[in-house]
């Protein structure tokens, strides 16, 4: 009798799961299926086919998928290959504190396209819980002065290294990365800056004094370890993160995921100084064969390494980690990161690290998150292409998440060895 097992059954979303099937016939082919519904009831699903060993066992840590949504040895393939039933869907966890994702795993007889797969019951099934927050993490709603967001504190007395988490063009408040980072020991402020609560509904300008207030708010908290903080940022959030690192002396470590090294849309303003946006050329906005918009060719002015529009990154005192998806269809992130690095090197700076991933797209998220190659952006335009190939994108997410944490710890925690 077939038996499906998964260890652990309940874990954080960035933790791997060991899946096995035992009790099969020797060399039997079995179909493994995974599915979940998000908080709006949207279905995401994946499947892969495996052949049992001579003793009737399948172990995803060692055995290759023969077909389905991925091929080869990929222990977590059922998770990162999940696809939305509705086109242009993106898996985003909104309520991180009160409920996990429930992922249903089934071991089934293989089927052919013309068969009715409902007729055959599964050989075995189970349900996994995938949490975005560890036990003991506290969430504090933030509405202080102008600041809007959510502060996540790890369990314990602290103090903990502080990080500000910034997302991009979707607006609103995204909490899933901040809650997960707090689960790994960082006091993390998910900071909203437009299209949320009483904040502006459109990003007409980037007021850096607002973000400075966010930094000061975080550093005032008794459980936050000063004197500096880190930034974790993506897309327009990374544009703002870079601007903060240049202008705010408290920024010690900045993670820039697929961001520009210039102002892309709305001007940045700080104490009267204005950083104007780069002129974009609409001729280079491409609608691909699937009807998805690709923006990555639009900022041709920045191709010149001495472009007057580039941020003066050499003025920053902290360290940078550039995370680049080389198949990004929203920004030419590889070019922009290399341009910023060249600017640092020209000024004798060595305060940077580059992680560049072939085949990875724009939305590099925590490990095992399904690749979103395209999604709707109703506030901007109907649909955007984010790029990325499933397997290399998954590998980039797993590797970069570990490196991001190492980078933040390296530059935000005191060097105890120097005190010995």
Swiss-Prot record:
Compartments reported by the entry: Cytoplasm, Cytosol; Peroxisome
GO aspect biological process, one term: glycine metabolic process
N6-succinyllysine modified-residue sites: 40, 346, 350, 409
InterPro entries to which the protein is assigned, alphabetical: AB_hydrolase_fold, Acyl-CoA_thioEstase_long-chain, BAAT_C, Thio_Ohase/aa_AcTrfase, Thio_Ohase/BAAT_N
Catalysed reaction, written as an equation: choloyl-CoA + glycine = glycocholate + CoA + H(+); hexadecanoyl-CoA + H2O = hexadecanoate + CoA + H(+); choloyl-CoA + H2O = cholate + CoA + H(+); chenodeoxycholoyl-CoA + H2O = chenodeoxycholate + CoA + H(+)
Gene Ontology, cellular component aspect: cytosol; peroxisome
E.C. designation(s): 2.3.1.65, 3.1.2.27, 3.1.2.2
GO terms of molecular function: carboxylic ester hydrolase activity; choloyl-CoA hydrolase activity; glycine N-choloyltransferase activity; long-chain fatty acyl-CoA hydrolase activity; medium-chain fatty acyl-CoA hydrolase activity; N-acyltransferase activity; very long-chain fatty acyl-CoA hydrolase activity
Tissues in which the UniProt entry reports expression: Highly expressed in liver, kidney, gallbladder, proximal intestine and distal intestine. Weakly expressed in adrenal gland, lung, brain and muscle.
Active site: residue positions: 235, 328, 362
Modification sites for Phosphoserine: 125, 418
Pfam families: BAAT_C, Bile_Hydr_Trans
Keywords of the record: Acyltransferase, Cytoplasm, Fatty acid metabolism, Hydrolase, Lipid metabolism, Peroxisome, Phosphoprotein, Serine esterase, Transferase
Main location: cytoplasm
Subunit structure: Monomer.
Function per UniProt: Catalyzes the amidation of bile acids (BAs) with the amino acid taurine. Selective for taurine conjugation of cholyl CoA and only taurine-conjugated BAs are found in bile. Amidation of BAs in the liver with taurine prior to their excretion into bile is an important biochemical event in bile acid metabolism. This conjugation (or amidation) plays several important biological roles in that it promotes the secretion of BAs and cholesterol into bile and increases the detergent properties of BAs in the intestine, which facilitates lipid and vitamin absorption.
Family note: Belongs to the C/M/P thioester hydrolase family.
Protein's UniProt name: Bile acid-CoA:amino acid N-acyltransferase
Source organism: Mus musculus (Mouse)
